[in-house]
Amino acid sequence: MHTVTLLTREGCGSCVRVHGQLLPLCEGAGARLEVTDVDRADDPDLAAEYGDRLPVVLVDGAEHSCWEVDDDELLATLAGPDPFAGWD
């Protein structure tokens, strides 16, 4: 199962929009959706690395997109092989 991570922060209107966009896409593709607030994460480097480009979408830990999400591109990625299959 792929993991889609939405990097966000409080007060980010675009992040709310992208979250609403990701919910049905992840559900339909059978992917797990996680939301991480970069300002409250255990990793302080997240805010430094991504804070000026939010929202950022990661797929299986790799950056997929920022600001805008192309539905078809994301679905194609989620239809591909899971690099961590069998690690559970």
Task: Tell what function each PLM region has.
Residues 1-25:
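Local sequence-structure signature of Cys/Sec-based thiol-disulfide redox active-site neighborhoods
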Residues 47-53:
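Thiol/disulfide oxidoreductase modules built on the thioredoxin-like
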Residues 62-88:
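Non-catalytic, surface beta->alpha helical segment in thiol-disulfide oxidoreductase systems
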Residues 31-43:
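Thiol-based oxidoreductase modules, predominantly thioredoxin-like and allied folds used
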Residues 43-44, 71:
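Structural motif corresponding to alpha-helix initiation and N-cap regions
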Residues 54-63:
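A short, hydrophobic beta-strand/beta-hairpin element that forms part of a small beta-sheet core
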Residues 1-3, 24-32, 79-88:
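Short, low-complexity, intrinsically disordered N-terminal peptides in bacterial proteins
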